[in-house]
């Protein structure tokens, strides 16, 4: 409007360098450089006055680009650490990387030609693996830093460094000396594709696995004394077993029954079969033949009966198994091969059965199975060969496909088997009760995590810690060349540990046995060879409490917090717990927090084949097509992390990111408005004391106090989604839609130094500093950007040096808040009627309206009258109803009569509202309508408020 321009320069308009657009790809790295140049994290982590806070980092694997799970995990950690720093605690966060293991070894091997692989020595492989791991660490570190994560990036812990490896050997040594480490032949998860034993954590169970399951008759040759009177009259009596691994039949050494179940003799043609009574009917359908129940009896009577193996000339016993024998599937009788199953091994051990394992490391049958099967691979042609043989001898009752969960090697994506091998184990049985007690003393978030890990530790078998690979920490054992006896004691372990601490674990491959042995063993008349096994990588990372938390300056053990994905209940949480309990009798952590996995917006797992992968690097920096994949910056990603309930799996995708960017912009624009209205304000000179503030300002400080306490509680309880909701609600509902909406009038049109403007600026300054501080743990870059844009001298160089928001007791005004909440509720009703008039184009701006109002409660009516002075220049010029409702005039009525006759109205039994045209003319400066426009000869187009403002009195 042309006439406005005459007075435009007299308005107090927004002035701030704080940009509406974040320009995150440029601005965020600049802010990160600001932190680095001034060593903000380093200074706070060492000089804060509070107690140390240790969040011990679970090491990601040093292989491949970071994915959304990494971003979720590291950002959660950073939010917690930054909040603790703002609370004045010393927070040294040492990031770590898991650097050994098969995936890195395979990566190195894939890059070699067949000629290079043939000539590859263990040391060369290890050198290449180390170089690869270090390169991956550097790449991942740069990505983590781009997320805005603060850490000791220049001094991370790597499981391949000499000091770490030495500490790990220390842990192993302590467990040896306490009798928890032993060597034994035992079935372990074995990967023929990797030719190594695997830990539980290295298995995955993909959908869609189908096995060839078979039912086999095992002919009884001798009944036990208890079974003879019951079953002695049945000819051709056989045990019906079921298995999903036909290749294990040659290794069968027993059939197990459940002593608590009822079994039946059923007639099937001219044969009598023993099955679980409960399954007789379903097995009739499976075998497609009538199974007539002739007798029933308890399973316990079968113990010590004997049967003949269907393929070999050997007899084996019927044994009592455990509660793993059920009637959910199969026949209720379990084929038992102690060399090929955990339960089989335990039962076989109880009955003194041989641990028979006729399968080599490639998965091929050995000569122990006879000429017909030798050399066949158990995952390829062995099943068919065994089934063919069983069919020939008439022992096969039925074959059918069976879909079930089956363990695969997590790296090669190929099936595994159970295979008994000579391995090194940690005897969990030796300290299981201590471990369960330690679990109970930890605070688990969410609480169901405790049940999960308790169940896992209760039921787990001993931990196979040896691997037949080159890239890892060696198990420091020597073997007598003649007897094969292991040499592993305090002296030998300490000697190897000292060498590794100085030279790294390469020394195990570089040095001769004589150099690795302590002096007394070099010439004791025996010849030794060094072991070739390395430790399970879970033993590597599971020793980090010893190598890092208990050794690094500024850290402590037990750590205050471990925070990882929920899969780590069977991974790092558990391996760390077991090593710590074995060595020291307690958990390595006081509190454990777990989060779910990042899924797409439809709740599906991310995969390249589905094309639904959300790459954090693209979220931050943008993709090739920046319209389709805009550069949102790290803060939008961090805001997403704060918005989700991470206790379960969390979705992310384009729509969710757009929503986050929208919320981010709202917060940013709120901050910009606050900053822009402080351009001529210096709190040291211009701020008003609390008691001089109008009611509205005191009410807003009450709300600010509530908001900060809610945010603080959200951070303390790790419920970051409450932070997200509270900040968003405060910026949009309390500030933008209410306080700032009302405040524009006094900020823009008042005299610069007037009470009504300075009082508002006092609150804006408090709010903008509080907002910057409160969002800093999450929106770290925006918070710093706000702080650097403060138009007056800031208290500190960085927002993070300012400490947490300091709340004043005076701000707590519950009675005042109740009064203003009532006014806000009424304002919402008024806005509905104004909006109706606006939709009909009866008014453009609400300032074109006059509000007519009646309330039923006489006390409230009187209170409202106090807020509605007849003269614009009297009253507080802040708390008046016209400013609250953003109208030019308010007329209070003693009766509702006539209000409903207005075209735009609303009514309840408690109040009545009508909107009519404002009286007077429009002021060219403030756009309010007033009957005083034209009264000033000097400023004939202005109202009395604006004339006074130009004179410096309003």
UniProtKB/Swiss-Prot annotation:
The keyword Cell division does not apply. Binds 1 zinc ion per subunit. InterPro entries: aa-tRNA-synth_I_CS, aa-tRNA-synth_Ia, Anticodon_Ile_BEm, Ile-tRNA-ligase, Ile-tRNA-ligase_type1, Ile-tRNA_ligase, M/V/L/I-tRNA-synth_anticd-bd, Rossmann-like_a/b/a_fold. It is an enzyme of class 6 (ligase). Its EC number is 6.1.1.5. Zn(2+) binds at residues 923, 926, 943, 946. A motif ('KMSKS' region) lies at residues 605-609. It comes from the Bacteria. Its cofactor is Zn(2+). It is found in: Cytoplasm. One of its GO terms (molecular function) is tRNA binding. Monomer. This is Isoleucine--tRNA ligase. It comes from Synechococcus sp. (strain ATCC 27144 / PCC 6301 / SAUG 1402/1) (Anacystis nidulans).
């Amino acid at each position: 409007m042309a006439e406005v321009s005459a007075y435009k320069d007299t308005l107090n308009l927004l002035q701030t360098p704080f940009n509406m657009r974040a320009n995150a790809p440029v601005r965020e790295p600049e802010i990160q450089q600001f932190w680095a140049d001034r060593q903000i994290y380093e200074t706070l982590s060492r000089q804060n006055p509070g107690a140390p806070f240790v969040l011990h980092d679970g090491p990601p694997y040093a292989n491949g680009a970071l994915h959304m799970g990494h971003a979720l995990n590291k950002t959660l950690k950073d939010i917690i650490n930054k909040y603790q720093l703002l609370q004045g605690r010393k927070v040294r966060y040492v990031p770590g990387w898991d650097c050994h293991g098969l995936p890195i070894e395979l990566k190195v091997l894939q890059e070699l030609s067949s000629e290079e692989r043939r000539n590859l020595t263990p040391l060369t492989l290890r050198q290449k693996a180390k170089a690869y791991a270090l390169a991956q660490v550097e790449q991942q570190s740069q990505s983590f830093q781009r997320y805005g994560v603060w850490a000791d990036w220049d001094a991370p812990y790597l499981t391949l460094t000499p000091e770490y490896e030495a500490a790990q050997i220390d842990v192993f040594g302590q467990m040896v000396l306490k009798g928890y480490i032993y060597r034994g032949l035992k079935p372990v998860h074995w990967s023929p594709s990797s030719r190594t034993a695997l830990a539980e954590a290295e298995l995955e169970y993909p959908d869609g696995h189908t096995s060839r399951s078979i039912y086999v008759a095992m002919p009884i040759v001798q009944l036990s004394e208890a079974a003879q009177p019951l079953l002695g009259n049945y000819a051709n009596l056989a045990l019906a077993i079921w298995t999903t691994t036909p290749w294990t039949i040659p290794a069968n050494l027993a059939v197990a029954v459940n002593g608590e179940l009822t079994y039946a003799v059923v007639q099937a043609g001219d044969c009598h079969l023993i099955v679980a009574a409960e399954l007789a009917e379903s097995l009739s359908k499976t075998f497609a033949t009538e199974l007539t129940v002739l007798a029933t009896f308890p399973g316990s009577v079968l113990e010590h009966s004997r049967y003949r193996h269907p393929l070999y000339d050997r007899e084996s016993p019927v044994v009592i198994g455990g509660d793993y024998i059920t009637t959910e599937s199969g026949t209720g009788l379990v084929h038992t091969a102690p060399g090929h199953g955990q339960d089989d091994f335990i039962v076989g051990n109880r009955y003194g059965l041989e641990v028979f394992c006729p399968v080599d490391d490639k998965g091929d049958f050995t000569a122990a199975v006879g000429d017909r099967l030798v050399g066949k691979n158990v995952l390829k042609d062995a099943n068919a060969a065994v089934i063919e043989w069983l069919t020939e001898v008439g022992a096969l009752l039925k074959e059918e496909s069976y879909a079930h969960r089956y363990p695969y090697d997590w790296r090669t994506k190929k099936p595994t088997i159970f295979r008994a091998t000579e391995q090194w184990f940690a005897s969990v049985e030796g300290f299981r009760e201590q471990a369960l007690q330690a679990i109970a003393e930890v605070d688990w978030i969410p609480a169901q995590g405790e049940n999960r890990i308790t169940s896992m530790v209760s039921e787990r078998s001993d931990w196979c810690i040896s691997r037949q690979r080159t890239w890892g920490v060696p198990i420091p054992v020597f073997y007598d060349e003649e007897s094969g006896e292991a040499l592993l004691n305090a002296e030998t372990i300490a000697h190897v540990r000292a060498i590794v601490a100085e030279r790294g674990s390469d020394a195990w491959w570089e040095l001769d046995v004589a150099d690795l042995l302590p002096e007394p063993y070099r010439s004791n008349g025996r010849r030794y060879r060094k072991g070739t096994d390395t430790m399970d990588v879970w033993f590597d990372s599971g020793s980090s409490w010893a190598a890092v938390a208990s050794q690094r300056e500024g850290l402590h053990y037990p750590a205050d917090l471990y925070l990882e994905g929920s899969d780590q209940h069977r991974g790092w949480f558990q391996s760390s717990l077991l090593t710590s309990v074995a060595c020291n009798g307690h958990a390595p952590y006081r509190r454990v927090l777990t989060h779910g996995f990042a899924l797409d917006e439809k709740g599906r797992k991310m995969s390249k084949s589905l094309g639904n992968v959300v790459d954090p690097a693209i979220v931050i920096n943008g993709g090739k097509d920046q319209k389709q994949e805009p550069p949102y910056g790290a803060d939008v990603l961090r805001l997403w992390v704060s918005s989700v309930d991470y206790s379960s799996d969390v979705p992310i995708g384009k729509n969710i990111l757009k929503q986050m960017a929208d919320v981010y912009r709202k917060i940013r624009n709120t901050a910009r408005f606050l900053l822009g209205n402080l351009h001529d304000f210096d709190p040291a000179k211009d701020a008003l004391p609390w008691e001089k503030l109008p009611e509205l300002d005191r009410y807003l400080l009450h709300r600010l106090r509530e908001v900060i306490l809610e945010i603080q509680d959200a951070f303390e309880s790790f419920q970051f989604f409450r932070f997200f909701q509270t900040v968003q609600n405060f910026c949009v509902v309390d500030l933008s839609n209410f306080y700032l909406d009302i405040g524009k009038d006094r900020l823009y049109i008042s005299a610069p130094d007037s009470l009504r403007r300075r009082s508002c600026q006092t609150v804006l300054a408090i709010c903008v500093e509080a907002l910057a501080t409160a969002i800093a743990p999450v929106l770290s870059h925006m918070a710093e950007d706000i702080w650097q844009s403060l138009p007056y001298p800031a208290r500190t160089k960085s927002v993070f040096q300012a400490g947490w928001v300091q709340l004043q007791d005076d701000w707590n005004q519950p009675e005042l808040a109740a009064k203003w909440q009532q006014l806000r509720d009424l304002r919402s009703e008024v806005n509905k009627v104004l909006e109706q008039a606006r939709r009909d184009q009866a008014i453009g701006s609400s300032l074109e309206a006059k509000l007519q109002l009646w309330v039923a409660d006489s006390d409230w009516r009187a209170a409202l009258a106090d807020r509605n002075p007849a003269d614009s220049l009297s009253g507080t010029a802040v708390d008046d109803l016209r400013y609250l409702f953003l109208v030019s005039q308010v007329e209070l009525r003693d009766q509702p009569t006539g209000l409903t006759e207005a075209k735009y109205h609303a009514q309840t039994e408690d109040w009545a509202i009508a909107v009519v045209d404002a009286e007077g003319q429009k002021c060219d400066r403030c756009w309010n309508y007033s009957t005083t426009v034209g009264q000033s000869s000097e400023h004939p187009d202005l109202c009395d408020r604006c004339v006074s403002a130009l004179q410096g009195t309003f």
